[in-house]
């Protein structure tokens, strides 16, 4: 089927999305303390909820701070890693259709990413974001 699965393993939340023929398939969020548990739990739930078999998955891409704990293929599938700021920029560009933008990613912290054509770069950020506020509540 050729589905690409993207997984952002964050400190407080793991986000997962599928892409098939340039269409986004049902993004979900999972909360778990352990990043490996969070990744595999999110992946299993995503496949189950969307009636996708492992053989339908062409590739898995991981990013986020928790991706440092992933050293090999996820469930034996071709697995790659990408920089979180690049993933944020590419995702925002894909969804918006814009070639120039400032992307604000609010997670445990808040980052600012500049997209200008094919150039995507981190331009700053702060240590407070939605994850911080959620943790304080």
Go through each PLM region and give its residues.
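Conserved phosphate-binding catalytic cores of ATP/NTP-utilizing and phosphoryl-transfer enzymes
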Residues: 70, 75-104, 109-119
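Glycine-rich phosphate-binding loop plus the immediately following alpha-helix
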Residues: 118-137
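Alpha-helical scaffold segments in soluble metabolic enzymes
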Residues: 38-45, 69, 90-94, 135
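Short glycine-aspartate micro-motif
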Residues: 2-8, 57-62, 101-105, 125
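A short acidic Gly-Thr/Ser loop motif
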Residues: 8-12, 65, 104-109, 128-130
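Short glycine-rich, Thr/Ser-proximal phosphate-binding strand/loop in the N-terminal lobe
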Residues: 3-41, 120
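Short beta-strand-loop/turn "lid" adjacent to the catalytic site in phosphate-handling enzymes
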Residues: 29-32, 43, 48-84, 119-122
């Amino acid at each position: 089927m050729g589905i690409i699965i993207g997984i952002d393993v964050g400190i407080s939340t793991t986000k997962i999305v599928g892409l098939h023929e340039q269409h986004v398939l049902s993004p979900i969020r999972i909360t778990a303390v352990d990043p490996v548990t969070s990744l595999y739990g999110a992946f299993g739930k995503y496949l189950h909820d969307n009636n996708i078999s492992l053989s339908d998955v062409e590739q898995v891409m991981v990013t986020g701070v928790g991706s440092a704990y992933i050293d090999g293929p996820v469930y034996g599938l071709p697995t790659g890693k990408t920089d979180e700021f690049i993933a944020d920029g590419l995702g925002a560009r894909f969804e918006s259709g814009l070639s120039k933008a400032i992307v604000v990613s609010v997670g445990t912290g808040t980052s600012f990413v500049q997209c200008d054509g094919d150039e995507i770069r981190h331009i700053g950020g702060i240590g407070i974001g939605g994850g911080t506020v959620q943790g304080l509540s």
